[in-house]
């Protein structure tokens, strides 16, 4: 019975957190400020974890809810979407972090080894990889945005 309670709890968390993530004001999320700003050491960690090799292999919410912007299918005007994409990485990171914290409640629903195993699986495979992917992709998107902004400034200077 504990397993079923945990699964129902995690399912409800997933659905509710998705909708809350969509409703949160995007003005709360800034990729260049704490806690979303990536530290310099994170790039080494991501290389060690080989995030670039497995990030495309994990399930992607944008395939389930196509209104999200899938990074793999950028249209020709993707540069205009970069600020929103950066915000989305912050929202997704926040959501998965909260889900990790709330995931520990399952230990009350199913105390003991079984609950601990299910909670560990939920956190280690259901949320942590997605949080890592957001932190891995955000600096790359920020570099693209910065390059785009530099190009725009140069073009404006040339036109004047």
Where are the regions a protein language model picked out?
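Hydrophobic alpha-helical transmembrane segments
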Residues: 1-9, 108-121
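A cytosolic-side transmembrane-helix exit/cap motif
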Residues: 32, 135-146
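Membrane-proximal soluble regions of multi-pass membrane proteins
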Residues: 27-81, 85, 147-160
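Hydrophobic alpha-helical transmembrane segments of multipass integral membrane proteins
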Residues: 16, 97-104, 120, 124
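Transmembrane alpha-helical segments and their cytosolic interface motifs
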Residues: 82-114
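Hydrophobic alpha-helical membrane-embedded segments
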Residues: 7-54, 123-131
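N-terminal leader/auxiliary helical segments
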Residues: 1-17, 21, 101-102, 138, ...
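Residue-level signal for alpha-helical transmembrane segments in multi-pass membrane proteins
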Residues: 20, 102-109, 129-132
């Amino acid at each position: 019975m504990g397993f079923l309670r945990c699964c129902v709890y995690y399912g409800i968390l997933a659905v509710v957190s998705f909708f809350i993530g969509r409703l949160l004001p995007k003005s709360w999320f800034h990729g260049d400020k704490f806690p979303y700003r990536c530290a310099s050491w994170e790039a080494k960690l991501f290389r060690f974890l080989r995030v670039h090799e497995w990030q495309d292999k994990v399930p992607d919410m944008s395939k389930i809810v196509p209104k999200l912007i899938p990074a793999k299918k950028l249209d020709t005007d993707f540069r205009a979407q970069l600020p929103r994409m950066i915000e989305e990485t912050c929202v997704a990171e926040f959501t998965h972090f909260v889900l990790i914290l709330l995931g520990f409640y399952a230990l009350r629903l199913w105390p003991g080894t079984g609950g601990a195993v299910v909670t560990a699986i939920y956190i280690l495979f259901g949320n942590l990889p997605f949080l890592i992917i957001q932190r891995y992709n955000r600096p790359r998107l920020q570099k693209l945005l910065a390059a785009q902004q530099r190009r725009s400034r140069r073009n404006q200077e040339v036109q004047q």
